[in-house]
Design a protein with these regions (language model features):
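N-terminal intrinsically disordered, cationic/polar leader segments
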Residues: 2-116, 122-164
Length: 164
């Protein structure tokens, strides 16, 4: 098999601009809390699940490095009684190169980066809930593009100083 014509790096042929490149440097659980007051409850009905999602991106000190934090809060109740409360912040450190303007950086960091983190966070949520004695909670995929568009429409599209 020939590797001719294969370009593994972000460099582009001469005369053409380099393509944007988003690379995962690290991923980790930043914060995790699980409260399980309903562990002894025998579930016969499907619980009511409230899910909240929050997303932040910030520039790190090193050039082209950013931290993206995806937070999920799950509040499960049955007949008005709390079953469990799960809060998890899952973060990734990303290297983003060849994106000169802040608006495009922000779009990539708030759409593509969380899309890359989500499967890992989803597994953590399912495992923690299952280990708490409940059936695993499989979170539906999140439309990060729609979240980004809603954020921009609300005027939160401009990042605070020092973030992207």
């Amino acid at each position: 098999m020939s590797s001719e014509g294969f370009n593994p790096g972000p460099e582009a042929p001469q005369g053409q601009p380099a393509l944007p490149n988003l690379q995962v440097v690290a991923q980790f659980i930043k914060d995790l809390s699980f409260e399980n007051p309903g562990a002894a409850v025998n579930l016969t009905d499907r619980p009511q699940i409230e899910l909240a999602v929050d997303l932040n991106a910030s520039r790190l000190a090193e050039k082209d490095m950013f931290e993206v934090e995806l937070k999920i809060r799950v509040d499960a109740k049955s007949d008005g009684r709390a079953l469990f409360l799960l809060e998890v912040a899952y973060a990734g450190v990303f290297r983003l190169t060849n994106v000169p303007d802040i608006a495009t950086q922000q779009m990539i960091l708030l759409i593509q980066a969380p899309h890359m983190l989500f499967p890992f966070l989803r597994r953590i949520v399912a495992d923690v809930v299952r280990d708490g004695g409940m059936p695993p909670l499989m979170i539906e995929p999140i439309d990060f593009l729609a979240l980004y568009q809603a954020r921009v429409a609300q005027g939160a599209g401009q990042p605070p100083q020092g973030t992207a």
